[in-house]
Amino acid sequence: MTQKNTGPRRRTAVACDRCRRRKIRCTGSDIPGQPCLACQKAHADCHFSTTSWRACRKKSAPLHCPSTNGKTNVLPSYASTPSLSPMTSSHFPYASDGTLISATNHCDDCSYNPHYLPVNSNGSSPSHTSSLDSIPGYASGSGPFKTPYRPVAVSESSSRSSFSMGSSEFASSTWSQSPMQSSLYVSPSSQPLDRFSPASFPSKETLTSSSLSSSVPRSVSLSNFADSNTSNYPESSLLPAAKVGNNGFVGSNVLGSMSYSNVEDSVRFQTDSVSQMSSKSLEHLPMLSEMTLSSSASFGASVSPKSTPGSNSTGAAVDTNSVHSNGGSDLDYSSYLTDSSAVDSPSLDADEVLRSFNLANDPIGAVDPLTLEIDQGSGSQLLGQQSFANDSLNAKQSSGKLGPLPPQSFNSSDYISFDEPSRYLSDDASLWPDQYVDKVQPLATMKTCNPAVFSSNTSLDDMFFFIRDFDEDHPIQTAY
């Protein structure tokens, strides 16, 4: 039996690259430069790296910066100073001897850094010698000050800053323009702002009269609106009526100092002023120069010059002497607005015209469509204007030949009456043939409506139910 003499196994400290990747044991060769046994069997290239993975591991060394003279400058130990202000020792490190050192780099050849502040032998920055010496804590390199400071105001336009530290000399310290000034931390003031002190508000010179937001409103005196009758009517002093100027147009209102004893006097004065303004502002128009606008207790109504003086229900009279006097021309402009043939008709009765315009005698159907009915509960005062065309239309309807059934008003109990047939219904019934018309019988069962049923505050639903119940109890024969 033969025995192989392989020799002792050689152990290497570093494996080849192939064995390291395969994580197998690498046995080196006795001859330098020869591959290992594993690579020889595999006929692979055996390569040993010059720098192994263990060589990459470096032990932790103290931070140092290379110097020009080849020496190593080790960082000095920091002095343990308590943090008494927002500017702690981390922002401004100090050595054990109390001198200020650089906060960024500590190399002698690092002057290219813009944030680097070179340190002199005395331990202070040359660019901040004058500014740091003005502070009591930094004078003659005595180290940081022990009293916490609180900046009051930092002005961006000037380099002066006032601080409250309890000393008068520190309040007037002057800081030079430097990068350190922009890096200072400004802490908020712990004292609240005194809003009642005169220093917290701008002076009177800064307040301009043209600025509405900064100007202080003046007090308004209501003594001009006081009157002897204001004791009985307190609302007249609180809400004074505006006096309308008579010489201007409609838009030029002037606040007057007159007061009125009640609301009716105020309305009467304002309506008179509006009527006078309307007459003066329309005098330059040639088409309206023939009319005379007269003011009364209410709005003055413009009526036709050809109408009778008693036909106007609002109280406006027609001045026949002033017709064709203001215009100065012979052309009758009223012929373009009205139909003169209907007014000058010989068959037209004056009593019919008077009855059609008299609201007190015949309130049903005599209300003009353009007439405004206001204040029904107090006095049923009618205000408005009547044109020339409306006068001729009412004159045609009052002739007794044609005319639709006018709308009835249920606001007052006096307007509803069933004791006599309506004349409008009889006039319309005369147009129908006799065989299709049943004579309307007057109702004597109900003379007038109950005043409690209809009032000025009655809704439409209440009137509807009342009429429906009344029709069921009293049927009315109608024409088909």
Swiss-Prot record:
GO terms for cellular component: cytosol; nucleus. It comes from the Eukaryota. It holds the Pfam family Zn_clus. Disulfide bonds: none annotated. Its main location: cytoplasm. Keywords: Cytoplasm, DNA-binding, Metal-binding, Nucleus, Transcription, Transcription regulation, Zinc. Residues 298-307 have a biased composition (Low complexity). One of its GO terms (molecular function) is zinc ion binding. Residues 298-325 are annotated as: Disordered. Residues 16-46 bind DNA. GO terms for biological process: regulation of transcription by RNA polymerase II. InterPro entries: Zn2-C6_fun-type_DNA-bd_sf (IPR036864), Zn2Cys6_DnaBD (IPR001138). This is Uncharacterized transcriptional regulatory protein C2H10.01. It comes from Schizosaccharomyces pombe (strain 972 / ATCC 24843).
